[in-house]
Amino acid sequence: MARFIDPRVDWAFKRIFGSEDTKECLITFLNGLFEDELVIKDVTFAKTEKLGLRPDDRGVVFDVYCITNKGKHVIVEMQKKEQEYFADRALYYTARAIVQQGIRGIWDYHLAPVYTVCFMDFVSQSPILKEFRTDLVLTDLQTRQRVSDRMRIVYLQLPLFDKHTEAECMDIFDCWIYIVKNMNMFEQMPFSEKYPVFRKLAEIGDLRKLSRE
């Protein structure tokens, strides 16, 4: 019998990354993912449901949506089942988070950056997604220079993560991906001595404790 929950399942993913009580998990994961580029000390969780701008517009429901202490917007999604246009879906979600920043009346169009992080428990057929990690940003075609930091999408294809043992994991980001892929198979939570956040994860993800709640 499994000891821990499976982070790739919707409710478990939200329990780990989308709760005020467990936001340390989200913060350490994001800091590991973006390293020194995005240093997060705290996050405020926002409403995950965004209605359309007009009555006939389609709304969206994010898995996790938060705003960092520096005002950056972060969306985190887990997609377990293969979806043909998931790359486009992530773009749509990012665009919605940008558009929702618009206000009526006098506005200078200053936008807060939006980061969308997509866990994918499948290998996409999209030609732009060939590696475990793909980062999409706005760049100039000629110079290849980044022209705006207002939008970034990170796709993480879990089946392409090539570190299969604890010893191969070199930093906290590697550890997080290894755990997300394999947590439901663990008897003990790895990396707990090196990174205290994983002791917290072991507590909130223990199925025995959940059954008593």
Name each region found by the language model.
Residues M1-E213:
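Elongated, amphipathic alpha-helical interaction scaffolds
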